[in-house]
Each structure stands twice: as structure tokens, then as C-alpha cells.
């Protein structure tokens, strides 16, 4: 069970909508993933929509919007501040989300570099603190720096979301040691966000101690999004179960230089018998 800010989810997989080639394919992938929480950029929202009436604004002309789709599927919306570069922009975007969608949850993204989409950790902590003071539950997208993650937690973040690698790269978890450190020290959920390329990345995140995984490109930009969404669902669950089971220690050789099975009961060489036969 994934619990964030007092709300419980059966699924530990959070999906994103960016990069989907069609609304129909997005819907099938979301259902296949089993997700119960999906993030959407507020820049896709148009005035006049509500979660239940967001009919034709953001999809094809005359079609259902992504907000309407999520509402119909019973998936909670996690609005994000993608594209914001300053605290002012992020706070205004969060306020828009609260007014338009009726939620005080926000995924805080402050981008420092348009090419890499890496987060601005200098602005991030202060912005998080201001949003929390204004009644928001902040899920903060951050670097894989354990110090920054801890400062976000101290600022009141409901969850910290360190990247595995830059958004959309599919490079996986480049610094597993740091992710493991963040998880070990955090008292709020740690959600791996960005860089997942395939199922092994998602499973590893859970094995390192993450409470959940957020991904978009790995599913929405692959050759078969529905199949990959299904695979990611199982990968996250497998990683979670493996972490709970506890892996064996890593060693340079077998413990005590002995094989894992006893030699008891195995056939032995009898010299006297061998002489008679030979």
C-alpha cells in the first residue's frame, strides 16, 4: 500500500501523460498499468474546464480531454508545474490547479535547464516551503542529492521525487547509491521520477527502497505502450516484493568457500573397490 499525505493507493506506479500519441492509446496504457494516480501538466488545462466537464478542450477537437479521461477512469489527477522556471510561476500554477481541479496536491517542478530538464534545486526548497505554508501537499521533483531531498522533507514536502536520470533519456538509475541513501534517510515517501527506460529500472528503484515509481516516456514513447504499461506494473510489484523479502548479501566468493549444497549423500570414491574393478 502506497500512502502519500494520508491517502492510500493500492498501486505503487504513478503514470504521466506526456508523450502519448493518442488519447485512445493513453487510456489503454493507463488501464493496463493499474495506476491510481497520474500527473498532468497544468499548461494543458484551459479555463472553463472542471474534472468532470473537461470535455473537448485538451484532446482532439470535440473529443474528451485528458482530465475528463482520468475522471472517467477513476484515476486521481496530480497536477504538475512543468515548464515553470521561477517560484512565482510555480505558485501561480499550483493555485490555478487548486481552483480548477479542486485539489491541494501538486507535483512541484522547477526546471533550471531547457535542454536537460534538470531541476533548479536552489529555488526548489524555498518554493516548496511557500506552497506548504499555503496549504498544498507538495510532491517535489528533485535531483538525486540526498542533502536536497532531506531539505525538501524538512520544508514540508509530502513526498520527494528524485530523478534516476534526466527526463526522457531512458538511462535508468545512474546513481543507485544516492537513491538508496535518500530512501534510507527519508520519513516521507520517496518516488523515483524520471529516467526509467525499461522494467529493470523500475524494479531496481523499488529494490533500493523507493515507495513508488513515476514514469511517462518509458510507456508512452515505446513501440507498444499497452504491453510496456503491463510490464511496468509487474516490475514495480516484483521490486517491492523483493525489497520486502530481503536479498542475500553480495560476496566476492561463496560463503566459507563452500558450495551451497552439502556433500552429504553424494557418491564417494572407494579405492579398494576401484582396484578390484580395474
From Swiss-Prot:
GO CC terms in record: cytoplasm
Subcellular location: Cytoplasm
Alphabetized UniProt keyword annotations: Cytoplasm, Schiff base, Thiamine biosynthesis, Transferase
Gene3D superfamilies with a match to the protein in the record: Aldolase class I
Biological process (GO), any one: thiamine diphosphate biosynthetic process
Chief localization: cytoplasm
Domain of life: Bacteria
Active-site residues (renumbered): 107
Residues that coordinate or bind 1-deoxy-D-xylulose 5-phosphate: 168, 194-195, 216-217
Catalytic activity: [ThiS sulfur-carrier protein]-C-terminal-Gly-aminoethanethioate + 2-iminoacetate + 1-deoxy-D-xylulose 5-phosphate = [ThiS sulfur-carrier protein]-C-terminal Gly-Gly + 2-[(2R,5Z)-2-carboxy-4-methylthiazol-5(2H)-ylidene]ethyl phosphate + 2 H2O + H(+)
GO MF: thiazole synthase activity
CDD domains: ThiG
Pathway connected to this protein: Cofactor biosynthesis; thiamine diphosphate biosynthesis
Function: Catalyzes the rearrangement of 1-deoxy-D-xylulose 5-phosphate (DXP) to produce the thiazole phosphate moiety of thiamine. Sulfur is provided by the thiocarboxylate moiety of the carrier protein ThiS. In vitro, sulfur can be provided by H(2)S.
Family (UniProt): Belongs to the ThiG family.
Assembly and interaction partners: Homotetramer. Forms heterodimers with either ThiH or ThiS.
Cited HAMAP family: ThiG (MF_00443)
Protein name per Swiss-Prot or TrEMBL: Thiazole synthase
Organism lineage: Bacteria, Bacillati, Actinomycetota, Actinomycetes, Mycobacteriales
